[in-house]
């Protein structure tokens, strides 16, 4: 079966959540999927760096950045770290920077917008907890599928 979000919605509509269509694609891979890891933070990407420094094992990092459009939570250096450590992608309720460089990486990246300002570094935030992002409840260990048509979440691997 295809892992296109449209096909997954058709086949598994009762089992999935569709995130509100608020994200733009910034990574070199428009299509990505994997089990979810979560972070909740605000204008501080210290935990993003910490998490991406760990083995990704094909996971997708979902970052609840509070929807801030005042600074970026991911740039080219953290994108390269994600690739090096085997992350499939990121979905960020916030901004990214170095968007041209991110677009060349073999990584899925969805975010609200690009912003040139870097975040603060105060080691604040939480990891591995339930989130509410783009109208959906998201839990660590659920599965995320993203492509040109949107982002969906399921309690189990689909397809």
Swiss-Prot record:
EC number assigned by the record: 4.1.3.17, 4.1.1.112
Organism, as annotated: Chromobacterium violaceum (strain ATCC 12472 / DSM 30191 / JCM 1249 / CCUG 213 / NBRC 12614 / NCIMB 9131 / NCTC 9757 / MK)
Alphabetical keyword list: Lyase, Metal-binding
Protein's UniProt name: Putative 4-hydroxy-4-methyl-2-oxoglutarate aldolase
SUPFAM superfamilies assigned: RraA-like
Family: Belongs to the class II aldolase/RraA-like family.
Biological role stated in the UniProt entry: Catalyzes the aldol cleavage of 4-hydroxy-4-methyl-2-oxoglutarate (HMG) into 2 molecules of pyruvate. Also contains a secondary oxaloacetate (OAA) decarboxylase activity due to the common pyruvate enolate transition state formed following C-C bond cleavage in the retro-aldol and decarboxylation reactions.
Cofactor(s) essential for the protein: a divalent metal cation
Cofactor: how bound: Divalent metal cation.
Record flagged with keyword Amino-acid biosynthesis: no
InterPro entries in alphabetical order: RraA (IPR010203), RraA/RraA-like (IPR005493), RraA/RraA-like_sf (IPR036704)
Reaction(s) this enzyme catalyzes, per UniProt: 4-hydroxy-4-methyl-2-oxoglutarate = 2 pyruvate; oxaloacetate + H(+) = pyruvate + CO2
Positions bound to substrate: 75-78, 97
First-tier enzyme category under EC: lyase
Single annotated GO MF: ribonuclease inhibitor activity
Keyword Cell membrane: no
Lineage: Bacteria, Pseudomonadati, Pseudomonadota, Betaproteobacteria, Neisseriales
Residues reported in the UniProt entry to bind a divalent metal cation: 98
The protein's assembly and partners: Homotrimer.
GO process terms (BP): regulation of RNA metabolic process
């Amino acid at each position: 079966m295809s892992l296109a979000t449209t096909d997954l919605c058709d086949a598994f509509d009762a089992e999935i959540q569709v995130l509100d269509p608020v994200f733009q694609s910034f990574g070199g891979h428009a299509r990505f999927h994997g089990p979810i890891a979560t972070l909740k933070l605000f204008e501080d990407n210290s935990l993003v760096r910490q998490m991406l420094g760990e083995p990704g094992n094909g996971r997708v990092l979902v970052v609840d950045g509070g929807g801030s459009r005042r600074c970026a939570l991911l740039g080219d250096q953290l994108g390269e770290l994600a690739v090096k450590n085997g992350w499939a992608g990121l979905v960020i309720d916030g901004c990214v920077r170095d968007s041209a460089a991110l677009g060349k990486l073999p990584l899925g990246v969805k975010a609200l917008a690009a912003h040139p300002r870097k975040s603060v570094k105060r080691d604040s935030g939480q990891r591995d907890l339930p989130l509410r992002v783009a109208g959906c409840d998201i839990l660590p260990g659920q599965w995320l599928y993203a492509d040109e048509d949107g982002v969906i979440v399921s309690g189990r691997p689909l397809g």
